[in-house]
Amino acid sequence: MAIDENKQKALAAALGQIEKQFGKGSIMRLGEDRSMDVETISTGSLSLDIALGAGGLPMGRIVEIYGPESSGKTTLTLQVIAAAQREGKTCAFIDAEHALDPIYAKKLGVDIDNLLCSQPDTGEQALEICDALTRSGAVDVIIVDSVAALTPKAEIEGEIGDSHMGLAARMMSQAMRKLAGNLKNANTLLIFINQIRMKIGVMFGNPETTTGGNALKFYASVRLDIRRIGAVKEGDVVVGSETRVKVVKNKIAAPFKQAEFQILYGEGININGELVDLGVKHKLIEKAGAWYSYNGDKIGQGKANASNYLKENPAVAAELDKKLREMLLNGGNGEQPVATAAFADEADETSEEF
């Protein structure tokens, strides 16, 4: 419907005044908002990137990853850091649990020499550090491990047994209000790792809940529920975990999708195993009996051997990864995905060796 000419002039003057006072981009028409094409960072898992719909976790947003103990929460966030660092981004890890293992992080591909790390004494200190890093505009990814370990100062200074009802929830609620706008302006991804607790007296429905109150649930653009659903074995030896991630909330694409992948001990997410499974599913890899073939060439007998072939031939893995992303991700813009870039780097290194 056409707007009256006088109203158009008044609106244009108002928009000009708002932009002059608060800066360009402070108000715009939704259809012109370029930020709708959200920049993402790969999770390190191709199937999870596809389940998220946008190719990874969104920049400038808050993400919550929660699940039981030893389900792969920290491993997943370290894979995100490794993917971000390969793109030249600056990352920070707020280790409230004081449990980060730098040797394990290095095995997953994290550049620990350039990873900012803080082990705060109180929850308020941790969140103030997050805010300071965000406002600097120089940090691209911040991980907080974990919400449950963000202990309010009053609780630390008090005695064991003292009642501190709702302190952590109030602290998180205030922090979310302060951080959300700054993260958008700085285009910084903030990931909170969270733990699960049981609600007492729940007869029907799911008794599980996350710590830190409800504010994080509302402010998070993406919430991921990660679970260990089985073991990966070589003979009788357990070498990893079968993992399922459910996208419980998603503001950038359709929610409730699931991804399943393997986390191998000391190696992280088995991306080559994912490429084999997805390649077979979408008919890019042929499977005849136990043999796997790609482009007419046999690449291995059994999934493990096919995965090893892709590991030893990163150029082939990069090509397969690119084809799968172009086929399965919506709104492809022709740019090289993060994971493909990582494979390409390995391919370059391999060609230099020979």
UniProtKB/Swiss-Prot annotation:
Source superkingdom: Bacteria
Name of the protein described by the UniProt record:
Protein RecA
What disulfide bonds does the UniProt entry report for this chain?
none
Gene expressing this chain: recA
What are the recorded GO MF terms, alphabetically? Answer: ATP binding; ATP hydrolysis activity; ATP-dependent DNA damage sensor activity; damaged DNA binding; single-stranded DNA binding
Described by its record, this protein's role is as follows: Can catalyze the hydrolysis of ATP in the presence of single-stranded DNA, the ATP-dependent uptake of single-stranded DNA by duplex DNA, and the ATP-dependent hybridization of homologous single-stranded DNAs. It interacts with LexA causing its activation and leading to its autocatalytic cleavage.
Which Gene3D superfamilies does the record associate with it? Answer: P-loop containing nucleotide triphosphate hydrolases
Q: Which PROSITE patterns match?
A: RECA_1, RECA_2, RECA_3
**What Gene Ontology cellular component terms go with this record?**
cytosol
Family as reported in the entry's similarity comment: Belongs to the RecA family.
Q: Where in the cell is it found?
A: Cytoplasm
PANTHER family with a match to the protein in the record: MITOCHONDRIAL DNA REPAIR PROTEIN RECA HOMOLOG-RELATED (PTHR45900:SF1), RECA (PTHR45900)
What is one process in the GO biological process aspect for this record?
DNA repair
Residue positions annotated to bind ATP are 67-74
Annotated SUPFAM superfamilies: P-loop containing nucleoside triphosphate hydrolases, RecA protein, C-terminal domain
* Keywords of this entry: ATP-binding, Cytoplasm, DNA damage, DNA recombination, DNA repair, DNA-binding, Nucleotide-binding, SOS response
**Record flagged with keyword Thylakoid:** no
Question: Which organism does this record belong to?
Answer: Yersinia enterocolitica serotype O:8 / biotype 1B (strain NCTC 13174 / 8081)
